[in-house]
């Protein structure tokens, strides 16, 4: 249905109410509000749509409404010179088949509410679409280590170097400090002692050998506190055999 049809009906009802009458919209007895005779409209006079008769009746109609009569009555025949079918002489203020829309309204046009854009979404303040703002002091996908700790790094205990073992106090890794009066690789030979035998005081250095009579070359007599790689051999003991005395340990 065209958009102007409801408006046309509304105007028709308003005109009818102003003149104190109405228009009959029946199928068989519908009345036309006015009759045109020789191009001049006769107010309040209409014709019946009945096919058998066309008696004029007093009706109040709308100025400018066209008349279309199809009847067999000779007086209202389209050939009658006094009645012109579909001939409308409009008043100066009325245009045939023309509808003036209400002021401020455009046909088929929608005015959006002020401040609103069609199909547009305004993001809440402080929020970026498709974006996440991390909490303060936090970096995305990043972990801050505890104070004093480096990422993927291990801080050794005080006095300890990473991947390094510090020996007990007084002991150096793979190193032996000889006591005073003892020189490394010095040899004091007892009677009957094989060459390269070493007599050591307590705290004997590495690779020092004290040979007893009859001891095989490179045998070691370790006093308490003897360092690593020392061997204490009894008389008749072969090389690489260890006899423990007291708290002596073979390292």
UniProtKB/Swiss-Prot annotation:
Residues 36-55, 65-251 are annotated as: Disordered. GO terms for cellular component: extracellular region. Glycans are attached at residue 120. It is found in: Secreted. Residues 1-22 form the signal peptide. Detected in the brain, lung, spleen, thymus and prostate. Residues 153-251 are annotated as: 15 X 11 AA approximate repeats. Residues 72-87, 241-251 have a biased composition (Basic and acidic residues). Residues 150-164 have a biased composition (Polar residues). The keyword Repeat applies. This is Protein PBMUCL2.
